[in-house]
């Protein structure tokens, strides 16, 4: 049973941490997603049973229904962990969506990559296109059908300021293959070595960070879609990518809200 990690809640918004492996919102009723978990939480808090556990993909109240209102403002890929904000009223959803469209959100990520980038700090700007059939994206030319601009800024994280500090993937420096494992124990400190990057998104394309970092030879540790070292891996891997910091203005009070994680929520 997944327990919600709620960072902040009031009558208008709810801010929580999405763990690795749980979808933000899914059409499947087989596994829980963040929307169903939060709706169950809201239903229990209000003392109503509602339909929060069964109707997971609905983000608006059905007339005559007791299901709590919840609007998805932004999403994280299912393998990725991090901070999400949800709206509990239509007015809050409208304001937050407007902020998101006008780049009013500060979305910051941490990624543990296999190789250090050529420059410790920089901007990546590419055109990307999504392949719905394979649920992947790739770098493309501006003329390709469906191409969209993708831009991010990255900076190498200094020593002792890491987010990824669990023993199995503690970064001890740059190595050629951060996915290599020792023969005696894959869980010992230092097995996964790499470079930790802080990333600030200007755009929010499908798999953007994963694709753009892989395109410069810096795939993310644990990324079975875009890390060549894991291309034949069939077992579940925990991707070392976390939306660790989020800034926005409260939709009602307009106060600047700041949330930050100190460690990756495994």
List where the protein language model places each region.
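RNA pseudouridine synthases
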Residues: 1-266
């Amino acid at each position: 049973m997944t327990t919600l990690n709620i960072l902040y809640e009031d009558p208008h918004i709810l801010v929580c941490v999405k763990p690795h492996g749980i979808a933000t919102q899914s059409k499947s009723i087989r596994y829980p997603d963040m929307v169903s978990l939060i709706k169950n939480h809201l239903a229990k808090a209000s003392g109503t049973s509602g339909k929060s556990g069964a109707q997971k993909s609905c983000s608006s109240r059905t007339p005559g229904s007791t299901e709590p209102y919840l609007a998805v403002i932004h999403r994280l890929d299912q393998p990725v962990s991090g901070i999400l904000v949800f709206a509990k009223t239509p007015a809050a959803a409208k304001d937050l969506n407007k902020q998101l469209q006008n780049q009013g959100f500060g979305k910051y990520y941490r990624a543990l990559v296999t190789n250090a980038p050529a420059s410790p700090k920089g901007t990546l700007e590419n055109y990307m296109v999504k392949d719905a059939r394979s649920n992947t994206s790739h770098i493309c030319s501006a003329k390709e059908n469906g191409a969209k601009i993708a831009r991010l800024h990255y900076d190498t994280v200094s020593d002792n300021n890491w987010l990824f500090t669990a023993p199995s993937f503690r970064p001890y420096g740059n190595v050629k293959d951060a996915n290599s494992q020792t023969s005696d124990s894959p869980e010992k400190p230092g097995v996964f070595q790499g470079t930790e990057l802080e990333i600030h998104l200007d755009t929010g394309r499908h798999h953007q960070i994963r694709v753009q970092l892989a395109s410069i030879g810096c795939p993310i540790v644990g990324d079975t879609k875009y890390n060549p070292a894991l291309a034949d891996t069939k077992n579940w891997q925990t991707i070392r990518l976390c939306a660790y910091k989020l800034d926005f203005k409260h939709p009602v009070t307009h106060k600047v809200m700041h949330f930050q994680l100190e460690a990756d929520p495994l």
